[in-house]
Amino acid sequence: SPNGLLQFPFPRGASWHVGGAHTNTGSGNYPMSSLDMSRGGGSNQNGNWVSASAAGGSFKRHSSCFAEIVHTGGWSTTYYHLMNIQYNTGANVSMNTAIANAPNTQAQALCNGGQSTGPHQHWSLKQNGSFYHLNGTYLSGYRITATGSSYDTNCSRFYLTKNGQNYCYGYYVNPGPN
């Protein structure tokens, strides 16, 4: 994705933990289209908002825990393990709009199945309907390098680069799209 298109999918100024890239299902190693992000807070996620990560979005509410936003240029972003989704299909949402909360319960997080080890959002990038490998993609001005296997947090294979500096998995503050 071009630099400036995407921001972290949590509110600007907030700090969330960003884990290693992985496939949408978590199995296999390609395309690593997804990131898990969490704010902490245990079983009370009511104040932890998930935000639209790109502009010009047409909202799709797939279920009570899964949403997608279709952006320009064939891009879309998906958000799983949600609760309290704020919009219905067809709504137009802009970048940084609060769309839902991270889930309070595992049952809510997994309303469409899968696995979860604690409250977090599962964010994915798609282009023309297919999951898109994040290696080389920009998110909040950070260029993602993801050359290992799913959930790999070894900083030689998964890291984010900004202004010539490499950053490993960990907490990031959302500066916006750049």
From Swiss-Prot:
Its cofactor is Zn(2+). InterPro entries: Dup_hybrid_motif (IPR011055), Pept_M23A_Blytic (IPR000841), Peptidase_M23 (IPR016047). Disulfide bonds join 65-111, 155-168. It comes from the Bacteria. The keyword Protease applies. It is an enzyme of class 3 (hydrolase). GO terms for molecular function: metal ion binding; metalloendopeptidase activity. The keyword NADP does not apply. Zn(2+) binds at residues 120, 122. One of its GO terms (biological process) is proteolysis. It catalyses: Cleavage of N-acetylmuramoyl-|-Ala, and of the insulin B chain at 23-Gly-|-Phe-24 > 18-Val-|-Cys(SO3H). Binds 1 zinc ion per subunit. Keywords: Disulfide bond, Hydrolase, Metal-binding, Metalloprotease, Protease, Zinc. Its EC number is 3.4.24.32. Belongs to the peptidase M23A family. This is Beta-lytic metalloendopeptidase.
